[in-house]
């Protein structure tokens, strides 16, 4: 009933598969676990009815929720997640003064909270490094990744990510959450509540920043505005692509100045429509 409350208590078992489309263990860059779409989820009910479509490797939609998550794992792991770590002094990676607490099985418990987000995702690896920086009038940003020669561009990307949030906040509205985490994991790039999972090796600086800009841009649509991508996929990817062009044009100005940074996307769209494969945007 409207304005009523129901409490569900659930127990479930699951096997973490080898890395599949979005989640799993031992991805191609050696990340131990990428834990996305990992728990039974309550379906969202909105103007389109119940959102009961599968989440497997595809878009997802869910109710805004508050999360209080405890994860017990071997104490030598470092976890990256979307949310606020409530006990950084009891686990490794987030505070140099940490006194890691573990039980008699050498397991530590991590406690994360997050308010009013669509989904809680996390990843764990024994070789993660955690770096953080705070953006003026913006979120605290966390980088959680395997620091090596293959990921050296992460350090160089920080001023670009800072500028990304500043440009987005000025042009499209304030990012409303206290933090955002870029986490090395998964199989490409996928956004979740207050974080994204991305592959972190190789690429050029512009390629890495472009991936971060795209996935971070989703936070303004798929997460804050909560477009249902299964019903209107063009709204999330379309607006996020618009953000991409707007931001990247300023972060990496073309050698030959162009009056309209969206010309390339417009030409691609026209080319696609000429194939006759275009579906109606609304229908």
Regions found by a protein language model. Give the residues of each.
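Solvent-exposed beta-hairpin/edge-strand motifs
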Residues: 1, 32-36, 72-77
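Short Pro-Gly-centered flexible turn/kink motifs
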Residues: 2-10
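A generic secondary-structure signal for well-formed alpha-helical elements
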Residues: 13-20, 46, 71-77, 172-176, ...
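Glycine/proline-rich low-complexity spacer/linker segments in large multi-domain proteins
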Residues: 13-63, 67
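Short, solvent-exposed loop/turn and secondary-structure capping segments
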Residues: 18-27, 80-83, 122-124, 192-196, ...
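Hydrophobic helix-coil surface modules that form long, contiguous segments used
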Residues: 41-46, 57-213, 242
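Active-site-proximal alpha-helical
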Residues: 168, 243, 271-283
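Zinc-dependent metallopeptidase catalytic helix centered on the HExxH motif
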Residues: 197-274
């Amino acid at each position: 009933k409207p304005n009523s409350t129901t409490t569900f208590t659930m127990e479930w078992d699951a096997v973490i598969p080898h890395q599949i489309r979005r989640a799993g263990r031992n991805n191609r860059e050696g990340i131990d676990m990428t834990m996305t779409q990992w728990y039974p989820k309550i379906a969202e009910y909105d103007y389109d009815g119940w959102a009961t479509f599968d989440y497997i490797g595809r878009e997802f939609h869910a109710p805004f929720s508050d999360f209080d998550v405890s994860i017990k794992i071997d104490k030598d792991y470092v976890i990256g997640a979307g949310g606020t770590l409530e006990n950084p002094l009891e686990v490794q990676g987030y505070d140099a003064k940490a006194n890691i607490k573990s039980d008699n099985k050498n397991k530590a418990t991590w406690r994360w909270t997050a308010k009013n987000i669509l989904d809680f995702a996390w990843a764990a690896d024994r070789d993660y490094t955690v770096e953080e920086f705070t953006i003026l009038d913006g979120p605290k940003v966390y980088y959680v990744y395997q620091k090596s020669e293959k990921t050296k561009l992460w350090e160089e990307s920080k001023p670009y990510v800072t500028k990304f949030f500043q440009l987005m906040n000025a042009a499209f509205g304030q990012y409303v959450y206290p933090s955002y985490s870029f986490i090395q994991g998964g199989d490409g790039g996928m956004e979740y509540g207050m974080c994204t999972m991305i592959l972190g090796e190789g690429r050029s600086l512009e390629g890495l920043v472009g991936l971060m800009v795209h996935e971070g841009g989703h936070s303004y649509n798929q997460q804050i505005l909560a477009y249902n991508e299964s019903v209107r996929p063009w709204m999330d990817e379309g607006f996020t692509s618009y953000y991409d062009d707007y931001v990247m044009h300023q972060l990496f100005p073309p050698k030959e100045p162009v009056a309209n940074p969206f010309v390339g996307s417009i030409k691609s769209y026209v080319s696609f429509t000429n194939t006759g494969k275009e579906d109606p945007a609304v229908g």
